[in-house]
């Protein structure tokens, strides 16, 4: 099965720095099956994220790339995934990041 990876960033991302390197272990990432991410992608298209760096603000997940999820967007993302029972681990990760005011990194396909 194809997976997406989500992890909590220990430090806030820095301007002009790219986060293209695939390093899920660095962020103690969890794996989420693409079948479940596919279900929520359309509902995230109005949520503000960053793709690959802080220099590229965008809406929606970088489905095949790297998404930087700011604390300000985490609550909305939790609302979107709440109805999908299979995303409970992701919901817990997002709640933890939100409570600690941390960024989340997403590695797409």
Regions found by a protein language model. Name each.
Residues 1-103, 107-109:
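Acidic (Asp/Glu-rich) sequence patches and key acidic residues
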